[in-house]
Amino acid sequence: MTVHNPLVKRQQGSVVVPKSTVRPTTNGTTLKTRVASTNTLLYMPAGWKPSEVSPPDPAEAPPYSGYAYETPASIACIYSLVATATGCNPNTVTNNPTGGAKTIAIVDAYDDPWAGPDLAYFSAQFGLPFSTEKFQVVYQSGTEPPIDETGGWELEESLDIEYAHAMAPNATIYLVEANSNYFSDLLASVQIASNLIQCGRTTTCPTGSTGKGEVSMSWGGGEFSSETSYDSYFTTPGVVYFAAAGDSAGTIWPCVSPNVVCAGGTTLRRSPATGNFIAEWSWDEGGGGVSLYEGIPSYQSAIKSIVGTARGVPDVSSD
């Protein structure tokens, strides 16, 4: 259950918005000129300075006493992916998820040259299995895309692959890197991701291909009048498409597509004294609402009194 308690004081600190997350004030009118943004915000505790904090040595197995920050094990405990423990305390729980049997294809823009090493380091840090045979970077055009000079897309890519792996450590993960953050490149990469899941190759799959899995899209842009023309990108049989709802008010595409599971965000609140779980809150910065152009899908008929005749999002939310 998602809870917001206005009587509880917000944790003090500041939020840093990467340049890749800032939406343009005006956007293009075609897929080749319209850009997508990441959905990443960085929380900095009050008084925090980079020189004051160093991560634990990967050789030290979690949990890390006194940190009280979420780990794969603590999040798995909250969502009952493992045997639960009282408080699901990050300082004490150690059971990581063990699921994942199929394929997850993550689509992002630009190259993250440290994606593989970052994932290996992350896995060692939190006691997760890691195999190079189950992680592959795929380039949209077959050649390495440029990097994002702001570093924002690299951050998004590392976060995406790490927590996909954390929650489904036995799944095969593809990171599909688009040439740019133009929608034309991102949607071409979505098609590649769909093919990789359905038949294990980047080109069109043979008739009768039966592969199954998920495509993750942690990006989006403001809605536009012709967006419904492109919802067919998310209809490959056996593939479930997920997209982020965003980190600011309102709706974004492709999250509002009726062919996509729109994922919102929450925050897990913990006792400052013990680290035990208190409640799950919705974000006041989280995206959501009713679409400007997408009609209500049949599967939302039960909430028509809330969304009216339009597609409502998000569908699910989690930390």
Residue ranges, per PLM feature:
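N-terminal zymogen propeptides
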Residues: 1-179, 199-210, 214, 240
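Extracellular protease catalytic domains of secreted zymogens
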Residues: 167, 171-319
